[in-house]
């Protein structure tokens, strides 16, 4: 089975959309729990909540990696997971087959395709945060809370956020998000 997250209801066929890879693709995971993190985009959510207007595609934000075969969410700022996912509802779509599917090399258990994917089933997720905590409790994914991060990781976050901010000169939504969530790091960067 393959899984895809979306805020949209009643999708019968997953259609390729312009992606981070610069071409229309459908992204799916072989693990339902891995799809949960795509129910919310922290940048989009923060901009909407703060009234920052925007038209066009949203910058993606993903603070996860993989550890011992499991997705691991890292909180890059205090309460980031609650902040990003609490109160966000959406749908997890299931597909039995992925026409033209290829393994996505940089994300374990992920599959991409440039072809439409027929939907087999749909699950409503009323609160993405609660679903993520349930998956953590079941041992299906890992969470490293901000207070648990090692000093080396905090230093990496500091450096990475400064670099991301500098490179996002033409992406005002992303800069707005970074300023709002990392004010101490961004202070004085202009």
Feature map (PLM): residue ranges:
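Surface-exposed, glycine/proline- and aromatic-rich loop segments on solvent-exposed faces
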Residues: 24-28
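Short, conserved phosphate/pyrophosphate- and ester-handling motifs at nucleotide-, phospho-/glycolipid
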Residues: 31
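ADP-ribose/NAD+-binding catalytic cleft of ART/PARP-like enzymes
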Residues: 1-23, 38-41
């Amino acid at each position: 089975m393959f899984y895809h997250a979306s805020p949209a209801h009643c999708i019968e066929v997953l259609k390729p959309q312009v992606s981070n890879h610069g071409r229309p693709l459908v992204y799916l995971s072989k693990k339902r729990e891995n799809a949960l993190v795509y129910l919310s985009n922290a940048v989009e959510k923060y901009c909407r909540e703060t009234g920052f207007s925007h038209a066009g595609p949203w910058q993606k934000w993903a603070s996860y990696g993989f550890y011992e075969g499991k997705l691991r969410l890292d909180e890059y700022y205090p309460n980031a997971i609650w902040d990003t996912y609490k109160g966000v509802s959406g749908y997890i779509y299931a597909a039995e087959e992925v026409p033209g599917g290829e393994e996505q090399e940089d994300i374990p258990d992920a599959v991409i395709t440039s072809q439409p994917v027929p939907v087999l089933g749909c699950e409503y997720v009323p609160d993405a945060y609660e679903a993520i905590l349930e998956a953590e409790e079941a041992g299906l994914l890992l969470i490293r809370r901000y207070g648990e991060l090692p000093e080396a990781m905090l230093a990496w976050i500091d450096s990475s956020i400064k670099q991301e901010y500098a490179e996002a000169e033409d992406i005002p939504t992303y800069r707005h998000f970074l300023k709002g969530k990392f004010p101490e790091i961004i202070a004085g960067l202009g």
